[in-house]
A protein has these predicted regions:
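A short linear-motif detector with a strong N-terminal bias
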Residues: 91-96, 148-149, 260-262
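Compact recognition or signaling/catalytic modules
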Residues: 158-159, 165-175, 242-243, 265-269, ...
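N-terminal [4Fe-4S]-dependent radical SAM core
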Residues: 41-116, 139
Length: 285
């Protein structure tokens, strides 16, 4: 057993206790989670991030307490704990340390790797990609579903269980949001998996309803371009996204979006976080 294994075990126990007590004493339990992150942070990025969390949580009247309480009450506890530790410790701490070590050796890889689940790719090819990224310190993966998502090879998605220390984000953004019963049951049984669902269509909303019923973690995502960047971050459109039931809201720029419009959205999201404008965590992909 390695030092990291022991540390993860301690974190697992502490997080379990916090999640157990969060309904009775949300303020203390949620602050304890932020304190844990700061305590085990190894790099400057992690220390600054969890220090920011601690400062934001000083405002007991802010919306983030309700946001986290909603997550705990609506999402399966094992999934919430697994994804939280895999991202906060494995990706942002252990993985980040490895990524810093190899910076001088090759181009700096991102902590979140993007992989397309094309029908032409085999499960063995995907396993090789995941294993190679893991060696470099990447523990989080955004898996892009094919346009007709129902055609996804379940053998590929079955690999998620073979990498329990990793986090996976199943991206439906470029799909028709169709699915088979086998696909849904397989993905909903993986505690280290979250879903990215596009806002807007009836098929998307039906998928969200099924994920809610199964207490799965998902984020609602909206794309923007040069014609609607300001509109996408307006109070009215963010309220529309919140009506779908997830406090995790993602914003994705179209490929030809200018840097000025990307910065517009980026700054608006940062401002909303710091001023705790919404009962949600806004994330710019």
């Amino acid at each position: 057993m390695t030092k990291n294994d022991i540390t993860r075990g301690l974190i697992d126990f502490a997080v379990s206790q916090c999640l157990k007590n969060i309904k009775e004493d949300p303020y203390r339990s949620i602050r304890r989670l932020a304190d844990l992150g700061r305590q085990f942070a190894k790099g400057r990025f992690q220390e600054e991030l969890f220090s920011l969390f601690q400062r934001l949580l000083l405002n007991e009247d802010g919306p983030y307490y309700e946001t986290l309480k909603q997550l705990v009450s609506s999402v399966d506890t094992d999934s919430l704990k697994t994804l939280g530790i895999n991202i906060g410790y494995n990706s942002w701490t252990c993985g980040a340390s490895r990524l810093r070590q190899i910076t001088a050796e090759k181009d700096y890889p991102h902590w979140l790797a993007e992989i397309s689940l094309s029908p032409e790719s085999s499960a063995s090819q995907l396993k090789e990609q995941l294993s190679a990224a893991l060696k470099n310190g990447t523990y989080a993966f955004r898996l892009h579903m094919p346009a007709q998502s129902i055609t996804t090879d379940t053998r590929q998605l079955g690999l998620i269980r073979e990498f329990p220390d990793c986090s996976f984000f199943l991206d439906f953004m470029d799909t028709d949001c169709t699915y088979s019963d086998d696909l849904l049951e397989l993905t909903c049984s993986c505690d280290n998996l979250a879903f990215l669902v596009p806002f807007g269509s009836l098929q998307s909303r039906q998928l969200v309803d099924l994920l809610n019923a199964r207490q799965r973690i998902y984020g609602v995502c909206r794309t923007y371009d040069n014609t609607n960047a300001a509109e996408r971050i307006s109070d009215s459109q963010i309220s529309e996204m919140l009506s779908w039931g997830s406090p995790l809201l993602f914003f994705l720029a179209a490929a030809d979006t200018t840097q000025d419009n990307r910065l517009l959205v980026d700054n608006a999201i940062l401002d909303a976080r710091l001023h705790q404008t919404y009962p949600a965590l806004l994330i710019h992909l």
